[in-house]
């Protein structure tokens, strides 16, 4: 009989790094408190921190940022942003000093109980929280004004029930401070909000980590237009993947193939179908323009034209 991952006291890693063994939050003497924590796992996201953190800090009870071997000052910049907002008391910085396997072939070849495993890394990160609810958040995801209000409302409403929140996001490809390209040709609604309990922990899946769920739980999808995912065209967007072949064929990787298509087209000076070119007004950064003005003012219901999604009846 298989024992559920979250059933025991915690997890130990095969390398014997006792300082990075995992104790599940629900087993700690102090227990868990009501509220919600946004958990960010980041590496070299310094340019995104000033956009990502402010709405999260306002919307959540706590923001936990786990820095995984950044060498660009991401942790320092995140600390500065939180302090500048007067919300440093909501911000927690942790360091994870081990190289983590990239999604795809590297992940598949890594033992699930290794400190280098994506699943172990995610479990360690979320084990640092103290609230009953968590948001799995990326270091390049920026809430719109509507998204911030929605997350703030949900963070106190869902803390006592087994509810999973599916949060939509749209790729925003940044060409400069004044120009970006918004991909409205991909419907991407993933599960980002989870209770912190033994039923909701991470395990190994073929290309990446996946969160376990009980047989019965409630799922609440949010509407489109609440969040963008920053993709800097002068950066290395696919560094966390082993190679392009790792997402070349699987239906699960349809989103990554779309991003690869859009990224390479824009690099070649072409704007793909269903990608919208957006110019910010003078003196306003294009990320602020899109999240505070363009998306909130777009007609509702906000729709994404993704024929493949409708044709294949995909979940996300």
Regions found by a protein language model. Give the residues of each.
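Catalytic-site signature of metal-activated, phosphate-bearing donor transferases
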Residues: 1-29, 108-126, 141-316
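Active-site-proximal specificity loops/subdomain of glycosyltransferases
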Residues: 13-36, 75-133
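Short, well-formed alpha-helical segments that are part of the catalytic scaffolds
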Residues: 19-27, 44-64, 76
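Active-site beta-to-alpha loop of glycosyltransferases that engages the nucleotide-sugar donor
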Residues: 33-36, 40-54, 69
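Residue-level detector of structured alpha->beta connecting loops
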Residues: 60-61, 130, 159
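Short beta-strand/loop segment that forms part of the nucleotide-sugar
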Residues: 61-72, 92-96
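A structural signal for short, well-ordered beta-strand segments and their strand-loop junctions
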Residues: 65, 133-136, 164-168
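Short beta-strand-to-loop acidic/aromatic patch adjacent to the donor-nucleotide binding site
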Residues: 131-144
């Amino acid at each position: 009989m298989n024992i559920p991952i979250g059933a025991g006291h915690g997890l130990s890693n095969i390398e014997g790094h006792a300082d990075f063994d995992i104790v599940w939050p629900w087993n700690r003497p102090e227990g868990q408190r009501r509220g919600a924590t946004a958990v960010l796992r980041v590496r070299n996201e310094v340019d995104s921190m000033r956009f990502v953190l402010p709405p999260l800090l306002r919307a959540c009870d706590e923001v936990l940022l786990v820095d995984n071997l950044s060498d660009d000052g991401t942790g320092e910049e995140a600390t500065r942003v939180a302090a500048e907002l007067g919300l440093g008391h909501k911000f927690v910085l942790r360091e994870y000093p081990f190289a983590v396997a990239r999604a795809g072939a590297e992940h598949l070849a890594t033992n699930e109980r290794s400190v280098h495993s994506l699943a172990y890394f995610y479990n360690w990160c979320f084990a640092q929280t103290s609230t009953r609810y968590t948001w799995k958040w990326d270091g390049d995801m920026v809430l719109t004004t509507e998204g911030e209000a929605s997350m703030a409302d949900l963070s106190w409403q869902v803390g006592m029930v087994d509810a999973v929140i599916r949060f939509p996001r749209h790729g925003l490809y940044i060409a400069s401070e004044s120009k970006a390209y918004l991909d409205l040709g991909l419907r991407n609604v993933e599960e980002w909000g989870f209770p912190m309990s033994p039923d909701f922990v991470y395990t190994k899946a073929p290309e990446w980590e996946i969160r376990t769920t009980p047989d019965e739980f409630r799922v609440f999808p949010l509407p489109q237009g609440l969040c963008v995912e920053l993709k800097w065209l002068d950066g290395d967007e696919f560094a966390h993947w082993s190679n392009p072949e790792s997402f070349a064929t699987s239906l699960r990787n349809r989103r990554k193939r779309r991003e690869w298509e859009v990224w390479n087209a824009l690099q070649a000076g072409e704007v793909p179908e269903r990608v919208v070119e957006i110019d910010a007004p003078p003196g306003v950064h294009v990320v602020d323009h899109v999240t505070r003005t363009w998306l909130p003012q777009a007609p509702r219901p906000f729709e994404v034209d993704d024929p493949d999604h409708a044709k294949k009846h995909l979940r996300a």
